[in-house]
Amino acid sequence: MDLNIKKDLASNWFKLLQNAICDDIIKLEKNKLKFKSTTWKRNKDKDEGGGEYRIIKDGKIFEKVGVNFSKVHGKFPIQFQNKIPGASKDPRFWASGISVVMHMKNPRIPAMHFNTRYICTTQNWFGGGMDVTPSSKDINEKKKFHKTLKSMCDRHYKNYYKKYKKWCDEYFYLPHRNEARGIGGIFFDYKKKDFEKDFKFVRDVGVTFQMIFNDIIKRKIKKKWTLKDKEMQYIKRGRYTEFNLLYDRGTKFGLQTGGNVEGILMSLPPIAKWK
């Protein structure tokens, strides 16, 4: 398959998914809120692509939710070329992706994160994942979440869940705190063996995330909470902020490749606290 066709298939899917997820969010908010949409360009002087990020704040369900789509191309800075597969041979790249971060008003509903991407250098691969960060323990929620992920992964390859869960546990970890960011999920990168199979998996990850966030919110939206619960949520958001600014690959990649700063930092919670 021609590389340009692969790029179009991937970026068109990410854009379609952005629209579908935003539609779901609006429905959950009873059609009473609209997204604030911002389009951006990677380079003001020449065409290097860009994207669109959409944000809702202060909803009945979502305290802040961001849904970002991007499709960019250009050259990696010299200091970044040895860190990206294939970039040392040729610094030119093309990348497209979608990222979603949900911070909830009700602290009994966990924060949720999802992203998938397709990156092309002299090599081409998919990456992404999803994870959930509750501010209070819910063992049944954790079991249900991971059962859904395992079922999805098993549709493609029996080893995926074990491999990508382990990768997620290792990735979403704060070494300076010696603690996990949340209850895990799946994380994958450098999927490049078979475009059609990998793309099918990536699409399934997106659809499964849609199903998961709708299910969690609808089951927990009427759960009562206290000010103590909210304070715990703010503290947990502090940990979330630490991870995103210190360790997150997507944040580093975006900032070092001329991405839109507001779009990159949309993942940060509206309010966070530290003890």
List where the protein language model places each region.
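Gly/Pro-rich turn-and-neighbor structural signature
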Residues: 2-85, 191-246
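Short conserved micro-motifs at the rims of enzyme active sites and ligand-binding pockets
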Residues: 80-82, 141, 197, 252-258
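A generic structural motif
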Residues: 6, 104-106, 122, 132-139, ...
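Compact, glycine/acidic-enriched structural inserts
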Residues: 122-166
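Long, contiguous binding/interaction regions
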Residues: 104, 251-275
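Glycine-rich, often proline-containing surface loops adjacent to acidic residues and nearby aromatics
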Residues: 94-96, 125-133, 179-193, 240-242
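Long, charged, mostly alpha-helical binding arms that flank functional sites
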Residues: 152-201, 216-218
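Internal mixed beta-strand/loop scaffold within catalytic domains of large alpha/beta enzymes
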Residues: 51-128
